[in-house]
Amino acid sequence: LGLAVADEDDLDFNWLFAAYVNEEHPAVQQILKEALDAGVVDNFSGYQEGDPDDVLKQVYAIWHVLQARGIRYSNITRTASEHANVMSQHVRFIDESLAMTQANCVDGSVLFASVLRKIDITPVLVLVPGHMFLGFALDEEGEEWAYLETTLIGDASARRTGGGNGGGRPKPGGPQRPPVSSDIDASLASFEAAIAEGQRQVDEAGEAFADESNRDYQMIDIQAARELGV
């Protein structure tokens, strides 16, 4: 996926990244279940609470569980067919990223966007030169946004450990929680760093996103893509 050059005109196919966002993938429900079982949040309510902090907490719950699964950054972008006039990008499907526990910037962004759409939090895919990260609305009206550098997900250890119920003793007669380490502080610190880095990149871009002719800076609206049949 990317740009194709026809004569001197670039054909922009970046909107196709939205096709990799799949909120109906069965793995999405499993991720949400693990997040609830881990106890980071009691429920996924989207914007119902009307509190941006509640939205951030829900996104963090997903971050924490993906860290527990061992997802790490992997900069694999090469495609099977390369052409001088086509700039392309390899994108993993959700199940590939989860099975291989690795994701590049695009893989991680579409994975998070898929889960957020499932819980009615509005995501966008943010494109800057040579890179992608995630944006998401903190309110239903889309007046306040946060940005997440998904490649930092491997920077803290919230890995699975032995045992159940958050690494401790399982509750008798109750459902088993996924064995997630109790080092919430390190996990939360990495999430806060990823939010700060996402915001830094948006601030650095300045007005570039407002220039529709600048294809290097785009925010791909997944809902708009869905309405167009993508």
Task: Locate the predicted segments by residue.
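A structural boundary/capping signal
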Residues: L1-V230
